[in-house]
Each structure stands twice: as structure tokens, then as C-alpha cells.
């Protein structure tokens, strides 16, 4: 059975995860805006005559690739924190259930 110290550790971690998860989510949302901004800047920088060529050049640019990589990394961080939060919540739920069942047997 889980000890009260284990549960306290999970609760403390949940509290710490909250701020980090909010920042990670904000970074992910911001990276989407940056991706569009970088694309537009690269598109406008192109000296090619056709729109399709400008688009291809913008999408193939190093700046766009970097912005895309930053977005992916932000998503990974946000998802890892979301997963950790969910896992810790399930551990606490299991402890609550086990504690309730144990109280029922004691009476």
C-alpha cells in the first residue's frame, strides 16, 4: 500500500507541475504564432516571381525548419508534463480507493 509520505510527494509534485505545465502550454501556443510569423517573413524575403515558388522557398528555409523544431520541442515538453500530472492523479485516486476500502474493513 502507498504510504502517506508517498502521497504527499505526489501532491507536492502536482503543485510544482502546475506552473511548469502552464508555461509549457504557453510556449507551445506561442510557437504556433512564431511558425506563421517565420513563414511570412521567409515568404516576403523571397525574390522568386511565382507564389508557389515563394511558398516552397519559405517552407524549405532554415528559419522555418528551426521554428518547426521549436514547436515540436514545446509540444513534447507540454505532453510529458500532462502525462506526469495524469499519472500522479491516478496514483492518488488509487490511494484514496485503497484507503476507503481499508476503512471499511476496520469497522
Predicted regions mapped to residue ranges:
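Terminal, low-complexity, charged helical segments
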Residues: 2, 106-107
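Short amphipathic alpha-helical "recognition" segments used for binding
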Residues: 12, 58-59, 93, 100
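Long amphipathic alpha-helical coiled-coil segments
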Residues: 25-28, 32, 36, 69-102
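Surface-exposed polar/charged interaction patches
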Residues: 17-20, 41, 61, 105
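Short, charge-rich amphipathic alpha-helices with coiled-coil/heptad character
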Residues: 1-19
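Extended alpha-helical coiled-coil "stalk/arm" regions
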Residues: 24-56
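Short, glycine/alanine-rich amphipathic alpha-helical segment
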Residues: 48-77
Amino acid at each position: 500500500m502507498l504510504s502517506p509520505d508517498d502521497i504527499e510527494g505526489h501532491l507536492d509534485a502536482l503543485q510544482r507541475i502546475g506552473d511548469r505545465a502552464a508555461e509549457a502550454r504557453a510556449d507551445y501556443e506561442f510557437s504556433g504564432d512564431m511558425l506563421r510569423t517565420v513563414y511570412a517573413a521567409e515568404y516576403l524575403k523571397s525574390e522568386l516571381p511565382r507564389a508557389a515558388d515563394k511558398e516552397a522557398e519559405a517552407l524549405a528555409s532554415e528559419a522555418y525548419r528551426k521554428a518547426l523544431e521549436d514547436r515540436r520541442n514545446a509540444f513534447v515538453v507540454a505532453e510529458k508534463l500532462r502525462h506526469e500530472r495524469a499519472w500522479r492523479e491516478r496514483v492518488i485516486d488509487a490511494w484514496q480507493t485503497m484507503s476507503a476500502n481499508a476503512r471499511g474493513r476496520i469497522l
